[in-house]
């Protein structure tokens, strides 16, 4: 009679623990915290999907007990044991450990630097490569990943084609004062991209409806909770599209992202103590006001902004507090917008542009509008903005050969995620933030 081989213990993630109640499993992770109570140890492990409490008894499992006793924080460990329901434990389950393998023990003489206590922000940013291991930071990064996934899924579902824009560019897109200049090959000058927009205008003429998603760089000397020098943007562009088309696309995109995060990352939002009821109401249509009316709102609030001024953080916050959804501000003065923005035929002093301002004071998350399609007008605008025509000959070709009305926008990922998470500062929502005085680690 042959003996049946015993099935190996399933290797699971902490996130899956509830599916394996009363079963013996193996989990691979790191020691997050440890509590001792006489002859019992209560280690808490993390594995990137969550944290779980374990229990091991000196009497029942002496080898496992000795392996864990005195183990240092963030030591890497593989544990095997039985999952039991425990309402008092994080996540509602705990593991009764039967075997332990210590993969790497953190030295006691050089302990893990981020202890379970308060640390200063500069210290945490210096240790950002370790700070992201904490449950709060990991939750934010999972929300960011969900926002990226849902945004791309939404654009794909509408028939937009993902195209890639270059990082090195020959000229400015948003203005010369915020360019990062780099030395290119054979004494050529190049710049880090400020936006992929000009390039998606080209691919939109090839593919109809497109978007790009990637990093952008702005050498803005702004030290605020809303600014990074490197951030990610999703930028759609569509041929035969107008301002209203992009406003509606922006409403649908932001709503889809927020609802997807609220549904699929509820646990992470709860960890951040985010008021999900504020997110659940983010559905189209969003409130809209003209730039003219926005000035009136600011005047009523006692803000000194006058017609023709651009809006900064203070102005955006005042306007956003009038609404519980993102607000669309449309038709800004043409003089404050980029050279490629089309003007309103009924009021040429206005641009066919819009910004979407997030509620709760998180500022602009979308900026876009309708582009110029006239070759002659675009040449004139380049000259008015003192931009080198030779660097934009390829862009002018788009107006020479089959120009059509087209429109698009850019959505700033980090500001959007910061708003969804309710974080105080944008530096928490990107794995390795690049700011005015920080490029390390």
What are these regions (language model features)?
Residues 91, 117, 172, 253, ...:
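Flexible domain-boundary/linker segments
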Residues 178-256, 263, 281-441:
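A translation/RNA-centric and nucleic-acid-associated enzymatic feature enriched
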Residues 139-143, 277-283:
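Extended, non-catalytic structural segments that build the interaction scaffolds
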Residues 145, 149, 166, 273, ...:
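An alpha-helix initiation/capping motif
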